Swiss-Prot record:
This is Salivary cystatin-L2. It is found in: Secreted. GO terms for cellular component: cytoplasm; extracellular space; vesicle. Inhibitor of cysteine proteinases. Inhibits host cathepsin L (CTSL) and S (CTSS). Modulates production of various cytokines and chemokines in lipopolysaccharide (LPS)-stimulated mouse dendritic cell. Suppresses maturation of mouse bone-marrow-derived dendritic cells (BMDCs). Residues 1-18 form the signal peptide. Keywords: Protease inhibitor, Secreted, Signal, Thiol protease inhibitor. InterPro entries: Cystatin_dom, Cystatin_sf, Prot_inh_cystat_CS. Induction: Blood feeding does not affect expression levels. Pfam families: Cystatin (PF00031). Coiled coil: none annotated. The keyword Signal applies. Residues 34-118 form the Cystatin domain.
Length: 133
């Protein structure tokens, strides 16, 4: 009886520890190809980041959303893995995901963006990093 109780307590404790590990961490989203919110966030992050890069003349644009992970905080962190390329739109113009298409000769880069959206729906790019082309 004592060993059965100890086993139940041990297994229960392991389940609680596993739950605590998941809570607060990033969770992968399997519907990232179908959810327009993720594409909107990808374009927001890419255009915001590229507009801030010194010496850059054209916006980058999203070629493909490869992976999406979310983390619930006081709002939501979205970690997106993207394929991006330089677009046909100059930085002096206004970025539009519909008109700023990837330049046919541009190299594609894989980038990871973290976008924070607070409870009021305001967004900011926390980080944006690309692998060397």
């Amino acid at each position: 009886m004592t060993s059965s109780l100890a086993l139940v307590l041990l297994l229960g404790g392991a389940a609680v520890c596993a739950e605590l590990t998941l809570r607060g961490g990033y969770r992968e989203r399997s519907n990232h190809q179908d959810d327009p919110k993720y594409l909107e966030l990808a374009h927001y992050a890419t255009s915001t980041w590229s507009a801030q890069q010194p010496g850059k003349t054209h916006f980058d644009t999203v070629v493909e959303v490869l992976k999406v992970e979310t983390q619930t905080v006081a709002g939501t962190n979205y970690r997106l893995t993207l394929k991006v390329a330089e677009s046909t739109c100059e930085l002096t113009s206004t970025y539009s995901k519909d008109t700023c298409q990837a330049n046919a000769n541009a190299a594609h880069r894989t980038c990871t963006a973290v976008i924070y959206e607070n409870l009021q729906g305001e967004k900011s790019v926390s980080s944006f990093e690309c692998a060397a082309a």
